[in-house]
Amino acid sequence: MSGHDSKYFSTTKKGEIPELKEELNSQYKDKRKDAVKKVIAAMTVGKDVSSLFTDVVNCMQTENLELKKLVYLYLINYAKSQPDLAILAVNTFVKDSQDPNPLIRALAVRTMGCIRVDKITEYLCDPLQKCLKDDDPYVRKTAAICVAKLFDINAELVEDRGFLEALKDLISDNNPMVVANAVAALAEIQENSSSPIFEINSTTLTKLLTALNECTEWGQVFILDALSKYKAADPREAENIVERVTPRLQHANCAVVLSAVKMILQQMELITSTDVIRNLCKKMAPPLVTLLSAEPEIQYVALRNINLIVQKRPTILAHEIKVFFCKYNDPIYVKMEKLEIMIKLASDRNIDQVLLEFKEYATEVDVDFVRKAVRAIGRCAIKLERAAERCISVLLELIKIKVNYVVQEAIIVIKDIFRRYPNTYESIIATLCESLDTLDEPEAKASMIWIIGEYAERIDNADELLESFLENFPEEPAQVQLQLLTATVKLFLKKPTEGPQQMIQVVLNNATVETDNPDLRDRAYIYWRLLSTDPEAAKDVVLAEKPVISDDSNQLDPSLLDELLTNISTLSSVYHKPPEAFVTRLKTTVQKTEDEDFAEGSEAGYSSSNPVDSAASPPGNIPQPSGRQPAPAVPAPVPDLLGDLMGLDNAAIVPVDDPITQSGPPLPVVVPASSGQGLQISAQLSRKDGQVFYSMLFENNSQSVLDGFMIQFNKNTFGLAAAGSLQIPPLHPATSARTMLPMVLFQNMSAGPPSSLLQVAVKNNQQPVWYFTDKIILHALFGEDGRMERGTFLETWRSLPDSNEVLKEFPGITITSVESTIELLTAFNMFFIAKRKNGNQDVIYLSAKDPRDVPFLIELTAMVGQPGLKCAVKTPTPEIAPLFFEALELLFKA
């Protein structure tokens, strides 16, 4: 619709639908075209015009391309709600796919691919096969994308009808845009498939590199992304690939530049020549710098990616730090990212320039930016030992400005500097103490208290300074209370005089009697008993030499960094999280959460929680109150350990909890307290005595009593559901309860490919429903009867076709010994069959059996003590193999 068609969006009078129906059936072409435009306009603004489906479909029989496009647009929107009527359009689609006009042929196959109705996919196959071999490249490139859409609707159909092979053939097409679309489609299919579909070999590589020079910019992005996954055979091949890709660094499109950088970084891992690497680093710097002259939004994406790049290859931009200096009109989100990169690029050579910039930023008006700038100075001091003194000088100058939030942030970072360089810069403590009265932020107070406690022997009036903080001890945040407690103990141990002795009595009394905070209370009791039992031992513990903190500017784990670098120019590189942390793969994990699955406000489907007598609880689902709740039984009296030391009263000591309540391994947090209104839920599937359980820990950090707990599990691959009700007693504030909920299998199974996704809903009487996602760990489902005889194992292995064998490598896993590996896997019902040597590698064979008695034949290959584990699984259900690999990796990394 053109710009002149805005009149169709104007509000129409009552009785619009009958009038449109009449116009759609008019004998005049122009009137029908205007009517379809009105229908599309109404549909666009949200009006329901589905009742006109048959009338609009009748308008498909036209030679007018514009009208045909509009009708197709209507069909895409309403075919899902009217699947039976959509079949009426099939004959026209098939006819249009054979039209002499290539635009109409492409339009027909594109529209059929967009209509996500199973009944239509059967009719799509024949036209699609013809279009994949069409003489016109425009039709072929459209058909290539349609294969990916069809795979998303019906993967089995795509494989059975040979569309994947046809798609691979298009990589050899003489038209670069067809090649690019074929690559894009294959890459999309590979993302949603567990088996290898798109593998680049040397022949394919040459074709892709040739097409790279001739296709459009977005085609180049698809090809570069595919090439970044190719592993060169040797350094020479890697150099040749990089040489062909390097010209893309000069491209005007930012996406092409970042994809080229990603591809070059991946190949650089294989290049051994230092000269070649040095030259590549020089070539990558200018295009990355150019990205920073784009719009702020693009700058932000570029900066997030550059942040990753400089962590891996800091030499690329080591001489370009000035381009990251903040401009006065930069948005705050750009300034923050520039600060991060400046810290990473700071060196002894450029630190003076960097400190001048940071000092300038610390005088700006944006409080968050100022805080970040002050903290950046401290991080540079920790990173660069030679520059630490200059950094401290700048911080002291900022303290003299007497701006409250600047002073407080400076004290926080100086505490970290003292940790990094103990007994070096303590001469500035007097200056810091001048600002005591202005401190009102918990972190700044805690930092100042730590400094006073740590250097109490060098501060003459340390007891007076701490006493000034103690006046408001009960009202202080937990962070400050904990630091005050420790600092007072340090002061007493360093200066065991009357003043500190009285202070510690007050603090310990407040921390054990007057507080509801379990962390504070527990720490106070630890100190209390340490001091009363053996003050010398207390000195060894409390005044022990602390580990020196290290530079935190490269905060990402190396394995995570490598994964993020393979995802440069994607959302993953902006979030700095791996894709699986925030994306569920559409084909494998997205499941419906309709009203019948998780009914908001309805208790149907939930397993309820009732406060019942423990004797009546089902076996294995017994609530276990944790140590956060005082145990009812009073233990043997605690000896008066403090009486002879300070004459303190021991009567206030809370009974030590029964250790049985602390049993069980720590569970992963699935609902943190911060997002659960104070309720924290930890959970994981487990197995005990042949029964599958859902182990759960509920912790109430809110101020209310929580009761009436209920749980519901969504449809899932294995049909896991609760076997009984959830037995959780009313949770009072600062208490917790652990339970093991028995589970049953194959009750509520989901359709579609296997997935480890477990969607859970938990509710109680006081809060809204909490939805969370957990993992089905396959080894929790393996049966105790999975052991095979060696002969049976060999016979089963040979009887299964090679296509049922799935391989995966785990480069980050190291086997320390064969025996410990066998012991670990046997504990999770993966039973040892045999082992052998293959050169300097050990090969272990194991067997397991899933709940449906489907065998898993496992072959593990690794070199003891060296990173890298190869796993082959042969099973009648190879589609489950990815879930097995996921569980195996979890076991080895636990």
UniProtKB/Swiss-Prot annotation:
GO biological process: intracellular protein transport; vesicle-mediated transport
GO MF annotation, one: clathrin binding
Membrane topology type: Peripheral membrane protein
Pfam families referenced in this protein's UniProt entry, alphabetically: Adaptin_N, Alpha_adaptinC2, B2-adapt-app_C
Keywords: Cytoplasmic vesicle, Golgi apparatus, Membrane, Protein transport, Transport
Cross-referenced Gene3D superfamilies: 2.60.40.1150, Leucine-rich Repeat Variant, TATA-Binding Protein
The protein's role, per its UniProt record: Subunit of clathrin-associated adaptor protein complex that plays a role in protein sorting in the late-Golgi/trans-Golgi network (TGN) and/or endosomes. The AP complexes mediate both the recruitment of clathrin to membranes and the recognition of sorting signals within the cytosolic tails of transmembrane cargo molecules.
Protein name, per record: Beta-adaptin-like protein B
Gene source species: Arabidopsis thaliana (Mouse-ear cress)
Upper taxonomic lineage: Eukaryota, Viridiplantae, Streptophyta, Embryophyta, Tracheophyta
